[in-house]
């Protein structure tokens, strides 16, 4: 019996509960808390018209709403407040509620308190979703009952009564979710850390500190998987309480998952096990080799080597990640909409042997783009720019040309929409070319999220007449 869950049910019944944000994760949360007998008020900055289809799901439930402009004005008198991950924990309204005695938490924080199963969790600036999905697939292929959640999969708190202590839970966690966490998973994976989300985090130091919460509360029995090739994550080992296992594409390790020639290998002291050939991995790019190494290090104690090998050679990737959309008259179109940072776009560009036509630009997260300039100069034959960050990306290429003389012959096309960008890219392309949407920027200046951006790109490409 899950006594913690029973205690939570008693605690929540008849309590005044505020849920901030009526998004994908909070829709099932609201329904679940209502079933437990909570007195719920749901808050959202969107108005009733924009939320119409979502609110219809709560028809027949006695739920109160505070919507639109000034929606947080009445955040008073609540026992418990569930914060959406994208909202900072220290805004004045939340601080005032805490001062009044309201318990402030989040869906993920409560889930960690109640979950009876072993938790594998992944964070990092890039590669989170692919690595999380790989771990999930490896565990599932081994025969475990698995649950996939966090940033992907389903909101798991509403499923907590179905999760058994013999199951495995696999989570993708962002810095926003981790920021206020006071529990860590049994197995924590940090794929890499580079500047990101500095439009929300007050500094790089705050961003890194949030990431550290994935292992900060571990015990000696837990495992921390770190990228040895990343300067920031390598240093995390000094603060770890549990068993540290590295992965590396560039270095031979005493203990960990590594690439030796073309072979993915796991070494533990004198024992070395060959897992799979890197050339057999279906999805392209050296960054995906790193993702496989990270996943291998996470599951090596509970998944057979042949199972890991099978997943390595059959996994075809995740949508919006160097996803081949279509080939038209010898021109291949790839959707890499997930690339919301320069490091992610660099990895995407390095996945191709020949120069590509790059569509880039979008919402400005206030992060540096300097590292992107040399890679564009080396790997791009035409640069098509859209969105707020277009001037930044153009500048780093021009700076690189001034510094090294490279990239001076790359045409730069500025467009006002994704539709125009695709048309311009296709007009420039010839047989054998690759056109890739890899924005190096978030999507919020034009789209709700990277999925909507990627889906729109696919719609545009699929509407082109051959």
UniProtKB/Swiss-Prot annotation:
> What subcellular compartments does it reside in?
Cytoplasm
- Organism superkingdom: Bacteria
Cite a single Pfam family from the UniProt record: Mur_ligase_C
Q: What is its EC number?
A: 6.3.2.9
One annotated GO molecular function is: ATP binding
Q: Where does ATP bind?
A: 124-130
- For this entry, the protein name equals UDP-N-acetylmuramoylalanine--D-glutamate ligase
Its recorded reaction(s) are: UDP-N-acetyl-alpha-D-muramoyl-L-alanine + D-glutamate + ATP = UDP-N-acetyl-alpha-D-muramoyl-L-alanyl-D-glutamate + ADP + phosphate + H(+)
Q: What does this protein do?
A: Cell wall formation. Catalyzes the addition of glutamate to the nucleotide precursor UDP-N-acetylmuramoyl-L-alanine (UMA).
Could you tell me the keywords of this UniProt record? ATP-binding, Cell cycle, Cell division, Cell shape, Cell wall biogenesis/degradation, Cytoplasm, Ligase, Nucleotide-binding, Peptidoglycan synthesis
Which pathway does the protein contribute to? Cell wall biogenesis; peptidoglycan biosynthesis
Q: Which GO terms describe its cellular component?
A: cytoplasm
Please tell me the species this chain comes from: Acetivibrio thermocellus (strain ATCC 27405 / DSM 1237 / JCM 9322 / NBRC 103400 / NCIMB 10682 / NRRL B-4536 / VPI 7372) (Clostridium thermocellum)
Q: Which GO terms describe its biological process?
A: cell division; cell wall organization; peptidoglycan biosynthetic process; regulation of cell shape
> Gene3D superfamilies recorded for this chain?
Mur ligase, C-terminal domain, Mur-like, catalytic domain, NAD(P)-binding Rossmann-like Domain
The record's comment on protein family reads: Belongs to the MurCDEF family.
NCBIfam families in the cross-refs: murD
